[in-house]
Amino acid sequence: MEMAKIGATKAGGSNRQALTDLDREGRDLFCNWARDAGCSIEIDQMGNIFARRAGTDPGASPVLAGSHLDTQPTGGKFDGVYGVLAALEVIETLNDSGTSTSRP
């Protein structure tokens, strides 16, 4: 729930609107978590974050998952971030079980 604390509202939701300091804080936190999970991080010109877990076949097409880390002004705790964190949880589960994948 560390992410939910960033921009937490009195109503129990989150307010991390795009391009704000709170959005940056959430993005930095996610990048730290992804690096801790062994992912490489790339950020494109638009600010999209690509966290990549290496596969045994670097030429294979990657498995993709995506969502967003910013919220609407009255977004709930899981507005957007749920999909991002679900993908990171899959990576952490693969790592914890010692499972390698051919696709990045």
What positions do the PLM features span?
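Acidic/His- and Gly-rich active-site-bordering loop/insert found
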Residues: M1-G75
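Alpha-helical metal-binding/catalytic segments enriched in His/Glu/Asp
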Residues: A65, G75-P104
